[in-house]
């Protein structure tokens, strides 16, 4: 279709697709930020192997978590809900991005800083989960898997891992006005601020 912005053109296709149902056929990924219950089990079964489905509509996702999991055993599913695994929530980003940015007096929050947050979260998800996180969420052994692709919001490691990544990215990208020199001391101060020392 004509008159698409450059941002939308990046995701456009020349394929003849008129419906969400058609778009889901052989798709590897679905990212929904729309309304509840627009994705059906048949849409999920038409997707490629090991599909990634981020059904992020709140309060109810594009497809119910249990229905999706019952439909596809190979699915990697995330929602914005705290009562299901893989809750994607901005609480994992904003406080820690701002903390790192403020601590180096960054003049702006740029793409390098946002990507540093993404990478730090991804790396943290692959690390062994502290017992206190398992207890807080009523779990026995959280570990990187289809049901745990992103850290939990109450993971105390977030404060010591995400802000330093943001601060370092701000410094490396030239937007930090007060660089950090002692990273160990900085991490220790972050832990003390949060009561996790």
Show the residue positions of the predicted features:
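Long, charged amphipathic helices and adjacent flexible linkers at domain junctions
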Residues: 180-197
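N-terminal Rossmann-like NAD(P) cofactor-binding subdomain of oxidoreductases
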Residues: 12, 33-36, 46-49, 56-63
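Glycine-rich phosphate/diphosphate-binding loop of Rossmann-like nucleotide-binding domains
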Residues: 1-35
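Adenosine-phosphate binding glycine-rich loop
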Residues: 55-163, 167-180
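A short, aliphatic-rich alpha-helical micro-motif
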Residues: 23-24, 44-47
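Short acidic, glycine/serine/threonine-rich loops at helix termini
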Residues: 1-4, 42-44, 64-68, 89
